[in-house]
Structures are given as structure tokens and as C-alpha cells.
Amino acid sequence: MATIFSRIVAGEIPCYKVAEDDKFFAFLDINPMVKGHTLVIPKQEVDYIFDLSDNDLAAMQVFAKKVALAIGKAFPCKKVGQAVLGLEVPHAHIHLIPMQSEADMLFSNPKLKLSPDEFTEIASKISAAM
Ligand code: AMP
């Protein structure tokens, strides 16, 4: 069965899309730690990020860099942090999180509750900065 993230890429489940190329896809995390929290995934369905081939892992990181630079423009911050957990969804993903402090990277923090309009505005701001 396809992962929830493959179903997002296929358009079967809605998302707030940020960017896409032939191999990778970026969309907002639905339970964001901060505004601008974005996930980058390979379209290829692989659970563990370190099971990607060297070439695909390197290309995913380069794609994530483009998204991270756009997040930093759209949401001024000290730096955009990157994390990989993958304990919940078995489809490799990089979390990109604009940080004002180390505390913004604590996954145990309560998550933001945003309206659909707010998610849409955040995704368009990042897309526009790409
Ligand atoms: P983890 O696998 O531990 O890195 O966590 C999975 C992340 O995916 C969590 O931050 C979730 O909020 C996020 N997530 C799960 N389902 C969706 C979805 N349908 N759209 C956007 N983000 C999601």
C-alpha cells in the first residue's frame, strides 16, 4: 500500500505544496513547530533515508537546500534547521524548520494550530521565494 506521502505526491490527499521537481516534493508539515516548517521527500517510496542511493540522497539534499534558502527568505530566522526522524511516516523526509533558537527544533514542543488560509499563505510565500 502506498504511503501517505506517496498519496500526497499523487494528488490523492491534499497538501500545502511548496515545490516539486521530477524526483522530489516539498510541502508544509501539517503539525508545524513554527511557521514555515516544511517537509522534503523523494517521490520514490523509500522508508529509511539512508537506504536511498548516494546519488539520490545527494540530489535530495540539493533540492532541500533550495527550499531551505526560500524558507529563510520568506521567514527571516537565524538559520533554517534540518532534521530527519522518520519515526511516524515510513517515507523518507527531511524537516526544514526556520529557527530563532535551538528550542525551535524540539520535536516535543506543542505544535502550532494554523487555519487553512494561514497554511496557504505560508506555502505561497515560500514558493514565491524559490
Ligand atoms: P516523523 O516521521 O517522525 O518525521 O514525523 C512525520 C511528520 O509528518 C510529522 O511532523 C507530521 O506532522 C507530518 N505529517 C504527517 N502526515 C502529514 C500530512 N498528511 N501532511 C503534512 N504533514 C504530515
Regions found by a protein language model. Give the residues of each.
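HIT superfamily nucleotide-processing domains
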Residues: 1-130
